[in-house]
Amino acid sequence: MYEFTGTDGQKALLSAELVDVTAATAEQVAFLNEQFDKDELKGFEISFIHLSQSKVSGDPVEFNSDYTSFKPIDAQGQRVQDVTVIGWDECTTESFTPEFDTGESITQCFIAAAPAGGNAPAGVMYDGGYEDPNPYDYYDGKPLLFVAE
């Protein structure tokens, strides 16, 4: 669990749990390769990381989000390249819905790219985003790690 601070200073206690880390299919990799210029993903293995989130308590946070505060990591907690795609139904992230605000969980999807044979994605870290002060900061704090066992 972690404390989320919204854009207008709202505070809520959120729960997050790693659901899975799965390899992209050949069709998904082909689609992603079509979306990027200059073979940017060539030689990379693509994975999807799914994270379940729910609100435990606190202020209303609907229409806020914190998915940009999660970054792919390997089993040692080191950053892995993330891939951002907007509007792709096969891997979505969303803002907190009114239903989320009343306790319903949502599942976020993150895309990771690792060199073939390199540090395989094993989860995500939460770095607290732009919160100030930020106890979860990647450089000056202690990010929360959600890693597959």
Predicted regions and their residues:
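Conserved functional micro-motifs across diverse proteins
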Residues: 1-48, 54-149
